[in-house]
């Protein structure tokens, strides 16, 4: 071998030794509800993901987004596919509580971290060992229920009625509002259920109105939350009407119309970031996200649900560079390192400050809640 060839080989080997390590793509698998009853929640999530970067920490991100049609079975099928066929390093989703709860066992058994965009605290219940692999970005129902009950008490409410979805979301909210009501000296005098796709709730509303509570809470999400609201107005109910943070999107305002004026609900502060003081920690992050979102999708197109998708990215943007120091994407070691990094996250999102711990895989506190009212079709901070 000639000296020139040996020199070339040596130079190549030396260059390779000091070249940056090339990792495989980081695969983020997403299942969300872009169609079906929860579409008004899932569409802004999907829209937000389309705005997100395709690199984190200098490494390429491969986004795979699937629609579960608001169906639990499809959410499970999507999750299995993303893990077994696409080798996802992390799962984001789903949009609603029943779907997310059904996904917990799958990701835990596969040891793939998951960031849910649904609300129920059951999704990250530390008493369930499977939730070691699960995190979520929306505020816990308990945090929001406390805000509602405190607002009711401060405004003279003594008795309340409840109507909510006949599923895990509605059941969770009924349990939480009963707990929060008792803690604030309020009495729940009636509770009713309905299905997300019901077109009439006349029977349930008549029972609620007959109980004559000072206020009624509707435990629903998306446009189906308008069904009992419109019926209550039609039946001339004169008390205060509260909704959950699950209805905070333009489609709900459009469907509910004037019947929702005066409605009260707890919400992440991002929705009304312009009305927040400069000292609020989320204002800067929320402004950046909403400015970008509305530049593409139109003025006042913001929703809290899009914010949940963005906050999922905020968490991953923090955790992925940490995990990359421990292992390469596409490996079980990387997924474990990513889970560990998520559990130590301390970051500011659009909804609040996420301070994760082994016992708290949501990490939000009272800074993630403001009470708002609907005033002539606009979201306004409540007094």
Q: Where would I find each of the regions flagged by the language model?
A:
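N-terminal signal peptide c-region/cleavage motif recognized by signal peptidases
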Residues: 17-19
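Extracytosolic ligand-binding ectodomains
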Residues: 2-8, 12-14, 24-383
